[in-house]
């Protein structure tokens, strides 16, 4: 009886190497409902991170204000602060990366693909970790510069530039807020990729 069942599986082109199974824990299988939720959550967070990163980069890239100060016309741009340039670059990279990974998630959902193997899971997990730390670092640097621009620094005798460029600072603040939200999504994505990676080790499956 066992032999007949194996023969039928072979005839249908199904083998242990191509059956789409997902394992979690010592000997358990992830319920189908949970699997769908995890995939949907990952897709949503990657799309949200992409959109927020694009919005942050666009707001900063288009941010400029011209004022006349002491009879001298000056224009404030994001390129005047290296921290904002770094933030634009980081969000541009995060947007491109999230778009590619989001497309992979969408294809996986639509095709019901087999769970990725360990090397691929490690690669995705590592890239997600790098992007999460990268975006958080860029946000932290930009927020520090924004605080100096808003409140100045008595120790270094740096003046409050936002007093002169209120619209520029307001738009830059909105861009930083979007970047913060994008970085938080990247952190959530790294947690999901960690779940997808380490569950492959629970049952001894998915080694290759």
From Swiss-Prot:
Residue ranges that the UniProt entry lists as topological domain Cytoplasmic: 1-39, 104-128, 196-208
Principal subcellular localization: membrane
Keywords: Cell membrane, Membrane, Transmembrane, Transmembrane helix
SS bonds (residue pairs): none
Gene Ontology CC, one term: plasma membrane
Subunit organization: Homodimer and heterodimers.
Topology term for the membrane: Multi-pass membrane protein
Membrane-spanning intervals of the chain: 40-60, 83-103, 129-149, 175-195
Topology feature Extracellular, residues: 61-82, 150-174
Family: Belongs to the Casparian strip membrane proteins (CASP) family.
Superkingdom of this protein's organism: Eukaryota
Protein's cellular compartments: Cell membrane
Protein name: CASP-like protein 2U2
Alphabetical list of Pfam families matching this protein: CASP_dom
């Amino acid at each position: 009886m066992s032999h007949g069942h194996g023969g039928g599986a072979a005839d249908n082109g199904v083998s242990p190497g191509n059956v789409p199974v997902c394992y979690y824990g010592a000997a358990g299988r992830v319920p189908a409902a949970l699997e769908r939720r995890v995939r949907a959550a990952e897709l949503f967070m990657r799309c949200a991170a992409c959109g927020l990163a694009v919005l942050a980069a666009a707001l900063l890239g288009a941010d400029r204000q011209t004022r006349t100060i002491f009879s001298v016309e000056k224009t404030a741009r994001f390129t005047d602060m290296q921290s904002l340039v770094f933030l634009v670059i980081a969000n541009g990279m995060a947007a491109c990366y999230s778009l590619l990974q989001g497309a992979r998630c969408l294809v996986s959902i639509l095709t019901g693909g087999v769970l990725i193997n360990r090397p691929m899971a490690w690669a995705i997990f590592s890239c997600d970790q790098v992007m999460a730390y990268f975006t958080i670092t860029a946000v932290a640097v930009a927020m520090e510069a924004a605080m100096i621009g808003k409140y100045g620094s008595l120790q270094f005798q740096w003046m409050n530039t936002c007093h002169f460029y209120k619209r520029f600072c307001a738009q830059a603040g909105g861009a930083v807020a979007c970047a913060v939200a994008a970085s938080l999504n990247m952190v959530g994505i790294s947690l999901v990729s960690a779940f997808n990676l380490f569950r492959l080790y629970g049952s001894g499956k998915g080694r290759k």
